[in-house]
Regions:
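Glycine/small-residue-rich loop that forms an oxyanion/phosphate-binding "nest" at active or ligand-binding sites
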Residues: 69-109
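Active-site rim beta-loop-alpha module in soluble metabolic enzymes
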Residues: 148-206
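Active-site-adjacent beta->alpha loops and helix N-cap segments on the catalytic face
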Residues: 16-22, 41-53, 121-128, 147-157
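C-terminal alpha-helical cap/extension of soluble enzyme domains
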Residues: 181-186, 190-256
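Hydrophobic, well-structured mid-protein blocks that either form specific transmembrane helices
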Residues: 104-150
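Glycine-rich tight-turn/loop motif centered on a GG-T
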Residues: 19, 23, 33-40, 71-86, ...
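Acidic (Asp/Glu)-rich catalytic clusters
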Residues: 24-28, 49-62, 101-103
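Conserved, mostly hydrophobic/aromatic
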Residues: 10, 64, 110, 224
Length: 256
């Protein structure tokens, strides 16, 4: 049986004179990019440059909308009602769609950022509003969402293309959610351990949780990082390991 998987990373998170991440380098190793849309990070010039780099390197572009929280990098919880969430989506995804249009690039997907992502996974009213906003911009844009989450199931029910995402460097609970960053087992730091877990998720549809149980999981795309040279090496190790195991690493626009 042939196995395919996408590798995605959050990019375009610099702002003004401030630089975050090694975007040009990480684009050599991933197949999809989640581009910040100016609220938790990014700005119009960064968005423009990131879409251009993605086109040059053949990396699929996704919108990465977050809460309007530059100071907290979009990681702080906010009280957001459904009408606000829908408008946030239209505003940010629509902006990145315009940059993609200017380069003749297809906007492949949308992936929420930080607290927006985490809350939408477990809050149906917020998830519904997010999907309403996505469909209002373009119903053909895929929703890249936490594997097995409410928002994944609701997007499938609506007929929205769904990319179920897993994480190379994070631990999972028995419920299929990520172990909170403040708890033991939240992070997988050893590259070989991470690779073995990713291979299990991709080829067997299983993952071992922080309690030692094995649960089902769907791995359409694996999130990796490019914050520094160590993260780049980690990402390269995962990609090379997948290829050696016979897994085809490709985005959803380049699959045969």
């Amino acid at each position: 049986m042939s196995h395919y998987v996408d590798l995605n990373s959050d990019l375009g998170e610099s702002f003004g004179n401030y630089t975050l991440g090694m975007d040009s380098e990480v684009l050599n190793h991933v197949t999809s990019a989640n581009v910040a849309c100016g609220w938790h990070a990014g700005d119009p010039l960064i968005m423009d440059a990131t879409v251009r780099m993605c086109k040059e390197k053949g990396v699929a572009v996704g919108a990465h909308p977050g809460y309007p929280d530059l100071m907290g990098f979009g990681r702080r919880a906010m009280a957001v009602n459904p009408a606000e969430a829908k408008a946030y989506m239209i505003y940010q995804v629509g902006a990145l769609q315009a940059f993609c249009d200017s380069y003749g690039v297809t906007l492949q997907h949308m992936k929420l950022h930080g607290a927006f992502y985490n809350t939408a996974c477990v809050t149906p009213a917020l998830a519904d509003a997010v999907l309403d906003g996505l469909q209002a911009v373009n119903p053909n844009i895929a929703a890249m969402v936490l594997s097995g989450s409410y928002i994944a199931k609701e997007a499938q029910r609506r007929g929205i293309p769904v990319i179920q995402e897993v994480f190379a460097d994070r631990g999972y609970t028995d419920e299929g959610t990520l172990v909170p960053r403040t708890e033991p087992g939240a992070f997988i730091k050893d590259p070989q351990e991470a690779l073995e877990r990713v291979l299990m998720m991709v080829t067997e549809g299983k993952v071992v949780t922080n309690t030692g149980n094995t649960i089902d999981i769907v791995a359409d795309s694996v999130c990796v990082h490019g914050d520094n040279s160590e993260a780049i090496a980690f990402t390269n190790y995962i990609r090379e390991g997948l290829t050696k195991a016979g897994v085809t690493v490709a985005n959803f626009q380049n699959r045969k």
